[in-house]
Amino acid sequence: ISPTETAQSFYQKAFSLAADNLQLVLESYLSNPESLLPQDHSQKSYFPKLTKDTAKIDWSWNLNKIEAFIRALNPWPIAWTFVENLNHDIFKMKIFSAFINQNKSDLIPETVQIEGKNKTEWNEIKKYYSLIRKN
């Protein structure tokens, strides 16, 4: 898994790998079913159900966690936050991809979508909007 992997790209790789190896795994199981290990239920962990509400970015997190959160929620439900335009109107903005700048001091959105608008690049609209980085 690469550090820039999104949920969607991971699913595509995992499904392809599973499809390529399904026959081998089934043959191995059928020839030696006792070789399987039972699942250790004490090691289970839970992640809350994904909804559009749980996709809101928490700006109190560190930049690495926010960037990973954005990748994990692509293709659904897509991480989001609020932006303010020059007239001080506030809009919801989905962030499809982002990166941490060179000096590791800021998260830079890449592909975004302002509520009611088409998907675009942040560089094309950042002069009209500013991120609201509070919860």
Language model regions located:
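Generic detector of well-ordered alpha-helical segments enriched in charged/polar residues
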Residues: Y11-Q12, F47, E67, K126
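An anion-binding loop in the catalytic cleft
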Residues: W59-N135
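Proline-rich low-complexity regions
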Residues: L37-Q39, Y46-P48, P75-P77, T81
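Conserved short-loop catalytic and cofactor-binding motifs
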Residues: F10, T54, Q113
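Amphipathic alpha-helical surface "interface" segments used
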Residues: H41-L50, I90-M93
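Donor/substrate-binding cores of folate-linked one-carbon enzymes
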Residues: I1-Y46
